[in-house]
Amino acid sequence: MKVDVLLGLQWGDEGKGKVVDVLTPRYDVVARFQGGPNAGHTLEFEGQKYVLRSIPSGIFQGNKVNIIGNGVVLDPALFKAEAEALEASGHPLKERLHISKKAHLILPTHRILDAAYEAAKGDAKVGTTGKGIGPTYTDKVSRNGVRVGDILHNFEEVYGKAKARHEQILKSLNYEYDITELEKQWLEGIEYLKQFHLVDSEHEINNLLKSGKSVLCEGAQGTMLDVDFGSYPFVTSSNTICAGACTGLGIGPNKIGNVYGIMKAYCTRVGAGPFPTELFDETGKKIRDLGHEYGAVTGRERRCGWIDLVALKYSIMVNGVTQLIMMKSDVLDDFETIKACVAYKVNGEEIDYFPYDISEGLEPVYAELPGWKTDMTKMTSEDEFPEEFNAYVTFLEEQLETPIKIVSVGPDRGQTIERYTEE
C-alpha cells in the first residue's frame, strides 16, 4: 500500500480539516506529519463546529487510527484542553490516538521566548501566533529539544536543563515574564499525555502499510508557508510540502501515492508577509465577510485577494500534486466578475514563474472571467453547476495542468461535490 497526502497549496487556511474529514471514510489511518497548535483545522460535524489544533481530523470517524507523527510539535497543555473538549462532546480518543515518542514538546518557556523574540524585532516582526512553534523547532534542530518520549524517563532532569537554558536567554533579552500558571497547566498536560499510546510511529505506520492498511497523511498550514519554499522569512518553521510527510512520519518517498492539493477559489493570508493579489478595497472586505475569513486559532482577520495561479503552479510543482480540491467556491457566488492572477509584472517585465523574492515591486497580471451569480450552497452534483462556474473550473485546470477532483460549496461535509474530470 501507498500513503496519500493531503496538503494546502496557498498560505494556509485552505480548508484541509473539512476535506480530510470527507476523505477519511476511505482510509484506515489518518496521520498528521508537521506543525503545531498554531494551525487550526475548522470542521462542522453533526451540527457542531470544532477547531482541531494538534489532533488529526480523522478523530470523528470512530474506527480510524489517528497518528501524531514525529514532525509535529506538541503543547501538552493545549493538547489536554483540545482532547478533553472532544471527549466531552462524545469523541473518545485514548484508544484511537497514537503519538510519536519522537515528536518534540513545546515548553512553557518556548512560548515566552516566542513573545520575547517578536517584541525584540519591533516593526520587523514576522507575526507569529505566539504558540512557541519557532523556538521549539529551533531547539529541535540545535539538538536541545525535549521529546514526548522523554516524559517516560529522566523527565525532570531533561526539562530542568531546557528550562534553565531558556531562562538565561530571556535574562539576556531583559524580558519580564511570569511562568507560574503556564507551567502549572503544562505539567498537568504532561500527566495527561501519559494516558495515551506513545509509540515509535515510524515503525507503526510502515507496519500498517505492510498489512494492507490505507493511510492519509494530513499536513498543516500551506505550501507558501514552507520554511524552504515559502515566502521566507514570513513562513512557518517546518516543511509543509509533501516531502514533509516522509520526514514527519518516517516513510520513504516511494510510499507516496496520490497528492491532494487544496486551494480556495480565491486566496487568503494571515499575518505579515508578501501577498501579490491582496485586495485593499471593498472587494477584499466582501470576500472576508462572505468567507468568514478570521483565524481559527487567533481570530485575526485574514487578508483576502484573488486566486494566484503563478503561486499555485509553483506549489503544484514542488509537491507533485496529482489532484486538486477547490474550497469555498460559494464565497464567490455574488460577484459579477472573477479575477485570476496569471502572471507577475516586475520592473515592467512580465513573468509567469514564482521568483526568489516577491516582497517588493511586484504587480499581478489578471485574467477576468464572468461570475456565476448563483447560490451554489444547495447543489449536490456537478450537473447543477452554472455554465460560468464550469468555465472558471476549466480555465483553472488548463492553467494549472492538474484536474480539480473535488469542489466545496459550503462548510458542511455534505456540501462537497466530486467531479469526474478525465485525467
UniProtKB/Swiss-Prot annotation:
SMART domains: Adenylsucc_synt (SM00788)
Entry's Gene Ontology cellular component terms: cytoplasm
Enzyme class: ligase
Reaction(s) catalysed (UniProt annotation): IMP + L-aspartate + GTP = N(6)-(1,2-dicarboxyethyl)-AMP + GDP + phosphate + 2 H(+)
Highest taxon above the source species: Bacteria
Annotated EC: 6.3.4.4
Residues the record marks as active site: 13 (proton acceptor), 41 (proton donor)
Name of this chain's protein: Adenylosuccinate synthetase
Source species: Phocaeicola vulgatus (strain ATCC 8482 / DSM 1447 / JCM 5826 / CCUG 4940 / NBRC 14291 / NCTC 11154)
